[in-house]
């Protein structure tokens, strides 16, 4: 995002997304490999760890925001749809159940724990993918797709909240990265959002920074949104 803000990287990202789409053809299910351009076959499941493959929705959203790119959704839609269908195919009770590293490289260094407890982080990326594709389908006039992904977005979002978010605002047993991802991607309702923000701020005050590779970029903006300028 910072690079795109400071430099004209639009053509670079269009080309990179074409490489991403080509890499999906290297495996049987359309997963996105762990590198783009792909270095060998993308593999199934583990080599498409969530957070990496979700660039298929995150980068187009950035291009729209920074460059007012009107063509990117049409260009990337087949690739995005292929990946989202892979995600849905690996769901149980509307949540992802395959391996992932979670919010790795956090200061506590416990990568095994992060991998074993990757669910709230991984599934927040899926909620965002579904949100992006339902909007893209609507913009592109793909009504059947829009209805399908609208339903799945609502089901996965509700399943996430039910599984990891308690009524008092504690998220995933007070896991800092889960607070961040919930506030970033889950579009929490007003009262619940306020409670989650309060627990999130309390967690940061007690523990300092405990987010990893995925959560850290959102930490300060979310603290600012919660009115915690001094804590930032």
Report residues per predicted region:
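Active-site core of glycosidic bond-cleaving carbohydrate-active enzymes
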Residues: 1-231
């Amino acid at each position: 995002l910072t690079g795109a803000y400071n430099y004209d990287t639009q053509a670079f990202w269009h080309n990179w997304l074409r490489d991403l789409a080509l890499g999906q053809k290297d495996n049987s299910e359309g997963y996105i490999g762990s590198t783009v351009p792909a270095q060998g076959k993308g593999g199934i499941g583990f080599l498409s760890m969530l957070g990496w493959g979700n660039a298929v929705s995150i980068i187009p959203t950035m291009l729209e925001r920074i460059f007012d790119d009107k063509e990117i959704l049409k260009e990337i839609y087949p690739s995005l749809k292929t990946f989202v269908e892979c995600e849905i195919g690996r769901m149980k009770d509307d949540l992802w159940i395959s391996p992932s590293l979670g919010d790795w490289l956090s200061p506590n260094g416990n990568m095994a724990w992060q991998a074993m407890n990757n669910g709230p982080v991984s599934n927040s990326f899926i909620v965002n993918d579904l949100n992006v594709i339902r909007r893209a389908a609507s913009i592109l006039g793909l009504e059947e797709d829009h209805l399908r992904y609208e339903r799945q977005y609502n089901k996965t979002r509700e399943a996430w909240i039910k599984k990891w978010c308690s009524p008092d605002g504690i998220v995933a047993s007070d896991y800092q990265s889960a607070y961040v991802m919930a506030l970033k991607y889950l579009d929490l309702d007003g009262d619940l959002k306020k409670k989650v923000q309060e627990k999130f701020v309390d967690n940061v005050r007690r523990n300092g920074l405990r987010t990893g590779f995925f959560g850290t970029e959102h930490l300060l903006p979310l603290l600012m949104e919660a009115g915690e300028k001094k804590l930032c």
